[in-house]
Amino acid sequence: MAGRSGVNDEELLRAIRVIKILYQSNPYPNDSGTRQARKNRRRRWRARQRQIRALSERILSSCVGGLQEPSTLPLPPLDRLSLNPEEDLGTSETEHPQGTATT
């Protein structure tokens, strides 16, 4: 697949097939039974979904090589930051007074 270097396409497709099988192995529970039984089934289903999601992330990260660290963003100087809302009023030309609509 274009844009990736060093990743075997067959290995990636195999990982995706495994993840698909994992998700298909845990269908949403049916609506029969008492309210409490349905609630318990949904709770167990959500727990299994969390486990499947964690496994899927581990499979993909081992195949692709993990997530890239985001580059650090330059932050403004802390002495210019303010929590006073009065200083923030009217700083943007796109702000409109409350209650007026723009078309």
Curated annotation (Swiss-Prot):
Locus of motif Nuclear localization signal and RNA-binding (RRE): 34-50
Name of this chain's protein: Protein Rev
One GO CC annotation: host cell cytoplasm
Record note on quaternary structure: Homomultimer; when bound to the RRE. Multimeric assembly is essential for activity and may involve XPO1. Binds to human KPNB1, XPO1, TNPO1, RANBP5 and IPO7. Interacts with the viral Integrase. Interacts with human KHDRBS1. Interacts with human NAP1; this interaction decreases Rev multimerization and stimulates its activity. Interacts with human DEAD-box helicases DDX3 and DDX24; these interactions may serve for viral RNA export to the cytoplasm and packaging, respectively.
Native organism: Simian immunodeficiency virus (isolate EK505)
Modification after translation (UniProt): Asymmetrically arginine dimethylated at one site by host PRMT6. Methylation impairs the RNA-binding activity and export of viral RNA from the nucleus to the cytoplasm.
Compositional bias of kind Basic residues: 36-48
Keyword Transmembrane: no
Family membership noted in the UniProt record: Belongs to the HIV-1 REV protein family.
A GO BP entry: mRNA transport
GO terms of molecular function: DNA-binding transcription factor activity; RNA binding
Keyword entries, A-Z: AIDS, Host cytoplasm, Host nucleus, Host-virus interaction, Methylation, mRNA transport, Phosphoprotein, RNA-binding, Transport
Extra information: HIV-1 lineages are divided in three main groups, M (for Major), O (for Outlier), and N (for New, or Non-M, Non-O). The vast majority of strains found worldwide belong to the group M. Group O seems to be endemic to and largely confined to Cameroon and neighboring countries in West Central Africa, where these viruses represent a small minority of HIV-1 strains. The group N is represented by a limited number of isolates from Cameroonian persons. The group M is further subdivided in 9 clades or subtypes (A to D, F to H, J and K).
Function, in words: Escorts unspliced or incompletely spliced viral pre-mRNAs (late transcripts) out of the nucleus of infected cells. These pre-mRNAs carry a recognition sequence called Rev responsive element (RRE) located in the env gene, that is not present in fully spliced viral mRNAs (early transcripts). This function is essential since most viral proteins are translated from unspliced or partially spliced pre-mRNAs which cannot exit the nucleus by the pathway used by fully processed cellular mRNAs. Rev itself is translated from a fully spliced mRNA that readily exits the nucleus.
Renumbered residue ranges of the record's region Homomultimerization: 18-26
Subcellular localization(s) per the UniProt record: Host nucleus, Host nucleolus; Host cytoplasm
Residues covered by region (Disordered): 25-48, 66-103
Taxonomic lineage from the root: Viruses, Riboviria, Pararnavirae, Artverviricota, Revtraviricetes
Residue numbers carrying Phosphoserine: 5, 92
